[in-house]
């Protein structure tokens, strides 16, 4: 059952948006519309930038509802991975963020493939500066490995986020916020070297480009050359980022930027297998079961721009556009369980392009109603993903000995002999959204929002086109300030996800609907330098495709499986987190997540069973850094830990299991002088052997990194 406050929140959704007819005005005086007054003196501040703050928390974030709210003011479980924390823990790409972010699980499928999970569901939405990007099964292979050199911080909102992200699962949204130019000179060079011949260099420079400082620019470049604890594995990465900001007037700023990331890697696509019923085959962590000619290369180019105007009355308009061209080229191998035991290896070659285009226009600011000040945001967005994959596979299956495999023995197959494969589709989503934060009296804040979406899927390589028209996604939240430190809150959020399965009549099933109910308490200490929260959540995803137990003759005659939108899963649990400054010299972040997920309506053998066995029931993550005092004031020390309960994956008639484990990291840094800083990170101190991706009978098993060391030296202007 949903939490007790369901009915009251559902009733609140009926409230209209009478304030939605307001428009921003540049007039220095207030705009009066009867009882409504837009006050020029009301300003919503956004102090979300974390670079240079030295903090593990942030003052504001807008991912949840499009308004710059503090963590305490947001009626959902939200977190941030700041620039300081990225640097302290030596995070280099998005996988590192996911590994350490509260409540999120990183699942690997080899060195080049990954999946993110939260509250039992797959995360299929990323944002870049607030613009959503789709993450489908194969786009994860092309765009998810974002290098962090160009980002200021990553915001995390757990639960359904349909108001701002549109279609997706009720899991979480990650918002990667880019670095911006500074008006003062800023230059840094960081070089790192570590275990398995891993090397990395970053250069970051920013300054004003004219005397007045109205034109500013920033460039970032990074190069990484990684070997691996896995035999044959290596990767080279090149990252470039450039951005300029121009103040067209005192009120208007135009931003234009571009980035390029190139990854060239030796691929272990198939990765490591389990036995036919999940048995542990006790393979070493260095085992490589692909070939020395295998590769997985990726190229991502992004262009973005936005025009922001700040009106005298405190309102802000923003028009943002982004386009990403992502390519993935792979030629690699995968395993299959052989009849009678053992394994065979087959190969595949695929060229994938994924072009995503995003446009968003919004207007937000304060207004007065019945003598009280409130905030409103209005917007419209359009995003399109054009996906093309061409390639093929080879039917030939070569028997291999997984314990004595030589990557140089099996020759590279001839392209002419492959069985061709092609997948081409275009998904387009358009929407309008609105959210208002009402402040009826001082301790109480009510957020009401809604999104209206149109979704179209065009299968350009076959049949199965479909549309979703006027899908309504509501949002409701209540925050009550107990005192200057603590607030309690409750929220109801939704999200929808289209699906491709068809019913008996041949019609595409209606979208899945995800609902999230959440109640919690948040605390804000030391003027926002430290944030803490505890939340209970209860989520369902309904209308899931459910294969009919008895397939009608009409379905059998057309060689297709028919479904009904009858499946349902439920996820309940707890989120607890504290992050920020405990003292001026002590930064810390600690988070615990409890997830209980199960099938409610599904096949007989699934009903009541665990829905997400590959996400742990208990998950604990913590990181801390302390600056010593006195004669040791140039020294800082830190530690981090990731601990989780058991997980498993269904394999044959059994399970492949991962027992509970904990991974500990240590850090020490030394400030040599005002320009030079040294740091060393010792990861997996106890050399814990664990699966970061649980194996199946055909592969996918990926070990977490063994104990390793990384030295870093940074020069700052």
Annotated model-derived regions:
Residues 105-106, 115, 131-158, 176-178:
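Short acidic/polar hinge/loop motifs at secondary-structure boundaries
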Residues 134-135, 150-152, 163-240, 248-252, ...:
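Outer-membrane beta-barrel translocator/receptor signature
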Residues 224-228, 241-310, 323-354, 397-425, ...:
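Acidic/polar loop-and-plug regions of large Gram-negative outer-membrane beta-barrel proteins
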Residues 245-249, 354, 373-377, 381-385, ...:
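Structural signature of Gram-negative outer-membrane beta-barrels, strongest in the C-terminal barrel
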Residues 262-277, 384-389, 478-523, 528-564, ...:
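Surface-exposed extracellular loop regions of Gram-negative outer-membrane beta-barrel proteins
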Residues 306-312, 316-322, 326-332, 513-581, ...:
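Membrane-embedded beta-barrel scaffold of Gram-negative outer-membrane proteins
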Residues 442-443, 538, 564-651, 686, ...:
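Gram-negative outer-membrane beta-barrel transporters
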Residues 642-650, 658, 666-717:
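C-terminal beta-signal and adjacent terminal beta-strands/loops
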């Amino acid at each position: 059952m949903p939490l007790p406050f369901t009915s009251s929140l559902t009733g609140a959704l009926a409230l209209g948006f009478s304030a939605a007819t307001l428009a921003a005005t540049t007039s220095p005086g207030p705009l009066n519309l009867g009882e409504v007054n837009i006050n020029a003196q009301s300003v919503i501040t956004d102090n979300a930038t974390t670079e240079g703050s030295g903090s593990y928390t942030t003052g504001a974030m807008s991912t949840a509802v499009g308004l710059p709210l503090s963590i305490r003011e947001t009626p959902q479980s939200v977190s941030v991975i700041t620039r300081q924390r990225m640097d302290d823990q030596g995070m280099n790409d998005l996988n590192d963020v996911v590994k350490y972010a509260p409540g999120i699980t990183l699942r690997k499928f080899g060195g080049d493939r990954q999946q993110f999970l939260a509250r039992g569901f797959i995360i299929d939405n990323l944002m870049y500066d607030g613009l959503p990007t789709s993450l489908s099964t194969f786009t994860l292979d092309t765009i998810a490995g974002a290098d962090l050199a160009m980002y200021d911080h990553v915001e995390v909102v757990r639960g359904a986020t349909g108001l701002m992200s549109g279609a997706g699962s009720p899991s979480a949204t990650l918002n990667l916020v880019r670095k911006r130019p500074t008006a003062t000179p800023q230059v840094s060079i960081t070089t790192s070297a570590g275990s398995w011949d891993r090397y990395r260099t970053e250069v970051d420079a920013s300054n004003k480009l004219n005397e007045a400082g109205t034109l500013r620019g920033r460039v970032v470049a990074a190069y990484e050359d990684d070997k691996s604890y896995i035999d044959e594995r290596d990767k080279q990465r090149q990252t470039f980022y450039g951005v300029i900001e121009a103040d067209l007037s005192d009120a208007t700023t135009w931003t234009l930027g571009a980035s390029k990331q190139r990854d060239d890697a030796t691929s272990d696509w198939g990765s490591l297998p389990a036995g036919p019923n999940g048995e542990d085959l006790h393979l070493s962590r260095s085992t490589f079961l692909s070939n020395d000619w295998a590769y997985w290369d990726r190229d991502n180019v992004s262009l973005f721009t936005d025009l922001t105007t700040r009106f005298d009355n405190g309102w802000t308009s923003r028009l943002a556009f982004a386009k990403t061209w992502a390519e993935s080229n792979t030629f690699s191998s995968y395993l299959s369980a052989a009849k009678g035991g053992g394994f065979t290896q087959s190969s595949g070659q695929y060229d994938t392009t994924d072009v995503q285009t995003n446009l968003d226009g919004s207007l937000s600011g304060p207004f007065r109603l019945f003598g009280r000040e409130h905030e409103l945001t209005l917007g419209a967005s359009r995003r399109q993903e054009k996906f093309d994959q061409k390639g093929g596979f080879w039917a030939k299956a070569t028997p291999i000995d997984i314990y004595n495999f030589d990557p140089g023995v099996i020759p590279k197959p001839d392209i002419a002999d492959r069985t061709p494969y092609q997948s081409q589709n275009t998904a387009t989503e358009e929407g309008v959204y609105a959210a208002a934060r009402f402040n009826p009296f001082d301790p109480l804040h009510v957020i009401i929002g809604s999104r209206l979406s149109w979704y179209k899927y065009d299968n350009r390589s076959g049949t199965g086109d479909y549309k979703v028209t006027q899908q309504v996604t509501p949002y409701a939240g209540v925050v009550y300030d107990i005192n200057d430190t603590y607030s309690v809150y409750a929220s109801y959020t939704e999200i929808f996800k289209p699906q491709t399965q068809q019913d008996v009549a041949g019609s595409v099933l209606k979208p899945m609907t995800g609902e999230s109910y959440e109640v919690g308490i948040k605390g804000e200490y030391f003027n926002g330098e430290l944030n803490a929260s505890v939340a209970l959540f209860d989520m369902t995803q309904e209308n899931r495709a459910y294969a009919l137990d008895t397939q009608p003759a009409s379905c059998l005659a057309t060689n297709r499986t028919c479904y009904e939108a009858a499946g349902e899963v439920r996820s309940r649990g707890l989120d607890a987190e504290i992050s920020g400054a405990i003292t001026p010299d002590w930064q810390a972040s600690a988070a615990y997540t409890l997830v209980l997920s199960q099938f409610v309506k599904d096949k007989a053998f699934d009903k009541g069973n665990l829905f997400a066995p590959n996400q742990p029931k208990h998950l604990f993550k913590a990181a801390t850094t302390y600056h010593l005092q006195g004669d040791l004031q140039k020294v800082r020390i830190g530690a981090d830990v990731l601990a989780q309960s058991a997980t498993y994956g269904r394999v044959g008639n059994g399970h492949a299991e991962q027992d509970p484990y904990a991974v500990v990291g240590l850090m020490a840094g030394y400030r040599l002088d005002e320009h030079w800083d040294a740091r060393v990170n010792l990861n997996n101190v106890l050399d814990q052997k664990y699966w970061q991706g649980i194996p199946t009978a055909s592969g996918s098993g990926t070990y977490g990194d063994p104990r390793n060391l990384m030295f870093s030296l940074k020069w700052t202007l």
